[in-house]
Amino acid sequence: MHGIKRKQWTKELLRQKRVQDEKKIYDYRSLTENVLNMRDEKIYSIEALKKTSELLEKNPEFNAIWNYRRDIIASLASELEIPFWDKELVFVMMLLKDYPKVYWIWNHRLWVLKHYPTSSPKVWQTELAVVNKLLEQDARNYHGWHYRRIVVGNIESITNKSLDKEEFEYTTIKINNNISNYSAWHQRVQIISRMFQKGEVGNQKEYIRTEISYIINAMFTDAEDQSVWFYIKWFIKNDIVCKTLDEQEYLKMLKDLRENILLINNDEIEFSGKQNIWCLKILLVLEDILEEKEALTERSSEQYLVQLIDADPLRKNRYLHLLEQHK
């Protein structure tokens, strides 16, 4: 790192570090053996719980110890009051801050909430606020988004009220903040599907037109980001869109989208001298749909595949295979 003085490791310092490392390893192995022995002996006590805390702070990915911890808590549940459960949530949060992508921590937190002595909406609404803060720190954390869906589902179940529209707006905020947030796009897919299935969309055609405008804007914002293109591919092929729009409306949407993609690709060529790989890939998808609908006046698939061979040589064999199929 620039500006940071490199530490000079003398033989004595290396020896001291080796001694310290050996002690840490010994202590960890001793603690692990101790806790596993207590588990095997089915010791379910507060002291055993403390030992699991100590071990999980050293290794939060030790799933067997999380399982043992839950067994202890379940055994002592009748003696445990709300302050204990609050402290347990604090303990888990402390670990999540340092290890936000360890599944077992998220899993345990969910278990604690499900076994919390009261099932009031406030508990889950507070948890939603906690998830919001965690996603502010790492907006693309897959575990955080998955956990959020579970929390929202519990709030909806308790209150008997859908939060789909609020969650849709939340994805918009997150995507606007960072268009490459794949997790937010993925969440958007699920919410739109659910809203249509549950009849939560009033003017469905207008909703789709608004969404396609949002997509086009996203393409122009960052044409290199694959998250946008994955979403586009889902959107144009989804039954929700195909069945809501009539044939002419659907074809017009596809052709308008194609014109915008061609414009983006031409801008890319003018700016960098290179084709945009994602533009070419989605143009192929669009051509396949238009050809299937017998609405393709001029076929350019072979041209796009030849251009992809040049622009994306790592996948050359795939494009050659597709080129053979198109001949």
Swiss-Prot record:
Family under the similarity heading: Belongs to the protein prenyltransferase subunit alpha family.
Gene expressing this chain: BET4
One Gene Ontology biological process: endoplasmic reticulum to Golgi vesicle-mediated transport
Subunit structure comment from the entry: Heterodimer of an alpha and a beta subunit.
Catalytic activity from the UniProt record: geranylgeranyl diphosphate + L-cysteinyl-[protein] = S-geranylgeranyl-L-cysteinyl-[protein] + diphosphate
Family annotation (PROSITE patterns): PFTA (PS51147)
PFTA repeat boundaries on the chain: 44-78, 84-118, 123-157, 163-197, 207-241
Gene Ontology molecular function: any one: small GTPase binding
GO cellular component: cytoplasm; cytosol; peroxisome; Rab-protein geranylgeranyltransferase complex
Protein name per UniProt: Geranylgeranyl transferase type-2 subunit alpha
Annotated keywords: Prenyltransferase, Repeat, Transferase
